[in-house]
């Protein structure tokens, strides 16, 4: 009986030690990297970070020319009600009008968010999407999955 109890305890201990740790939540942080630029039409730029394949860690940073501050991981800060990162393997990013389109390859998504606030507007599913271009109010998306047709 003691041996059976010892075996059950050992199995329970192994199961508890095999549990995965909670994933870290990386909070955004800002650092001033240059002096503010005065009198420019360009307010700043977004940088899409690819992340590791299979880790769901594509992220978005923002550099503000008017303040000289670079903010890391702005997307998860501005969108706390959704998954903490953009997805798996960020591939391309484009601004069109008042929206930003981020192509997330392995997640099969194009994430659309507001250019001023970085708040997510919607996601568009495109299998194995890679790159994005705009011409005459149309978006063209390359995909390695064969023909793609998106009907809004």
Regions found by a protein language model. Give the residues of each.
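Short loop/turn segments that connect beta-strands within beta-propeller blades
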Residues: 65-66, 114-118, 151-152
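Conserved beta-strand positions in repeat-built beta-propeller and related beta-rich domains
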Residues: 47-55, 100-106, 141-145
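Structural motif
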Residues: 54-61, 109-112, 148-151
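Short coil/turn segments that connect the beta-strands within blades of beta-propeller domains
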Residues: 41-45, 97-98, 136-137
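Signature of short aromatic-glycine-proline-rich micro-motifs recurring in repeat-based ectodomains
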Residues: 30-31, 86-92
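Bacterial Sec-dependent N-terminal signal peptides
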Residues: 3-6, 13-43
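A short beta-strand motif characteristic of beta-propeller blades
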Residues: 23-25, 69-85, 116-124
